[in-house]
Amino acid sequence: MKQPPLAAFFGALLAEPRKIGAIVPSGGRLARLMTSEIEPTAGKVLELGPGTGVFTAALLKRGLPARDLTLVELETRFIAPLQQRFPNVTVLQRDARELASCRAELGSQVAIVSGLPFRNMPIEVITAIVGGGFSLLERGGAFYQFTYGQSCSVPSDVLGELGLRAERLGRVRLNLPPASVFRISRIEE
């Protein structure tokens, strides 16, 4: 039996609210801003913490081929709904902290879209995820992260340690709650 994405979201939220890090799934306006710089013909894209698939749907709507999109989701409740909703997209149940060891399996990526709640994570976990993500990104690639705060949810110490910079792309006031989107890239590029 199919489980609706919202049922999966609220089940996960009730079970582990800090792990989910949101009170409702991200909205369409946020999804459009998060994916606005990713060209459909650019290459492979990795999505971390896709949840109900709002960013996934936006990427596919922009024309990204399903074969070029891989979703990494740890929460068991989201796996089957994602596979049912996006049957041609690769969905991996994996901890994003393991990205650095997945290069052979995942290959190089042109972009990473992250829905992970970094504000609820220890700094060493954020460092492992972002550092692992950049080990997969091609030169010139970017890591897109949203946050409900005004500043980037990747701490400045982590950015500095990894040789990265964060630039705010915009704020979506009509999201619940309002959210900011950041593009994280290598300093030398």
Provide a role label for each language-model segment.
Residues 127-139:
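A short glycine-rich, Lys/Arg-flanked "PGG" loop and its adjoining helix->strand segment in the class I
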Residues 171-189:
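Core SAM-dependent methyltransferase catalytic element
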Residues 42-51:
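Conserved class I S-adenosyl-L-methionine
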Residues 1-40:
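S-adenosyl-L-methionine
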Residues 137-148:
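Conserved beta-strand signature within the Rossmann-like core of class I S-adenosyl-L-methionine
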Residues 75:
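Conserved SAM/SAH-binding beta-strand->alpha-helix loop
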Residues 53-57:
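Glycine-rich SAM-binding Motif I of class I
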Residues 82-83:
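Conserved SAM-binding loop
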